[in-house]
């Protein structure tokens, strides 16, 4: 009897292991089209800036050049002392540097996450890649097929306005705009009951968005979130599902609060 029990236990355990492996392999197979799309975005972004990026050319961006000039004293002080100064004498006879390329220890972790999200692509290349990937995530959250999402992302990313602000050097605005679509994706997923994935996306991209330091764009985006929440609330009211609506709204509020708290040092001085 004990031998039969051991054989049965071994068989059950083996079956369970093979089932887990099958499920993992199946999950990876489902992700293959999305991974192909991401690689395609990286290739498209790189090809668009060829041969300029491989040859090391630098785009003369007015705002970026002005920013470098304004922060020259700040940079030299940091190189000389290793400390970060919060004051400069080079603008308006002296002013705080809180919003001149702000850097705070509490938000430094986001730099590594952002680089990973951009696949460590070169400057200029990752600008377009971030626009492509962000809108792709949004369309996938709306359950569009892979090819439709990829096409929509390309149409979005290659809007003329984005290249105008790249040329002008409005990089903080571009970064913020790149992180808004995936933040909306997180919101959509939460209201569809995918609390963990949606909450993580909302927290991550709201943090990255605020860290991009273009509060004006983030402020405008708050209105989008507000009206989307109203729309989901009306839908929940019609379906007598207000309890679920408040629960999901609470998850979103916590996710957004986390994104804000990570950037609190910067926001405090804004």
Name the predicted role of every residue range.
Residues 3-50, 243, 247-252, 256:
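Start-transfer (signal-anchor) and selected internal transmembrane alpha helices
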Residues 9, 17-27, 31, 60-66, ...:
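Transmembrane signal-anchor hairpin modules in multi-pass inner-membrane enzymes, especially those
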Residues 32-36, 115-123, 144-152, 198:
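Membrane-interface starts of transmembrane alpha-helices
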Residues 33-70, 255-269:
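Transmembrane signal-anchor helices characteristic of membrane glycosylation enzymes that use polyprenol
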Residues 40, 71-72, 84, 103-106, ...:
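Alpha-helix initiation and N-capping motif
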Residues 45-138, 142, 154-181, 213:
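Membrane-interface coil-to-helix junctions
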Residues 132-141, 147-236, 248-270:
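Membrane-embedded helix bundles of polyisoprenyl
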Residues 238-242:
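Short helix-coil transition/hinge motifs at the ends and kinks of transmembrane helices
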């Amino acid at each position: 009897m004990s031998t039969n029990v051991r054989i049965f236990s071994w068989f059950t355990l083996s079956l369970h292991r093979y089932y887990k492996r099958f499920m993992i392999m199946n999950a990876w197979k489902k992700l293959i089209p999305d991974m192909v799309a991401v690689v395609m975005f990286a290739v498209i972004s790189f090809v668009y800036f060829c041969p300029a990026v491989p040859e090391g050319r630098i785009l003369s961006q007015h705002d970026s050049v002005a920013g470098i000039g304004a922060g020259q004293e700040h940079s030299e002080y940091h190189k000389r002392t290793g400390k970060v100064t919060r004051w400069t004498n080079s603008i308006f006879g002296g002013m705080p540097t809180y919003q001149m390329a702000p850097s705070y220890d509490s938000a430094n972790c986001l730099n590594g996450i952002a680089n990973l999200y951009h696949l460590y692509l070169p400057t200029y290349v990752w600008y377009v890649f971030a626009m492509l990937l962000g809108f792709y995530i949004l369309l996938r959250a709306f359950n569009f097929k892979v090819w439709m999402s990829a096409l929509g992302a390309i149409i979005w990313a290659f809007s003329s306005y984005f290249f105008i602000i790249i040329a002008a050097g409005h990089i903080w605005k571009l970064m913020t705009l790149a992180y808004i679509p995936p933040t909306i994706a997180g919101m959509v997923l939460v209201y569809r009951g995918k609390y963990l994935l949606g909450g993580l996306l909302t927290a991550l991209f709201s943090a990255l968005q605020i860290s991009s330091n273009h509060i004006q764009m983030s402020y405008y985006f708050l209105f989008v979130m507000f009206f989307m929440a109203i729309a989901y609330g009306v839908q929940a009211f019609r379906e007598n599902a207000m309890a679920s609506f408040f629960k999901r709204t609470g998850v979103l509020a916590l996710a957004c609060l986390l994104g804000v708290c990570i950037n609190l040092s910067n926001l405090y001085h804004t």
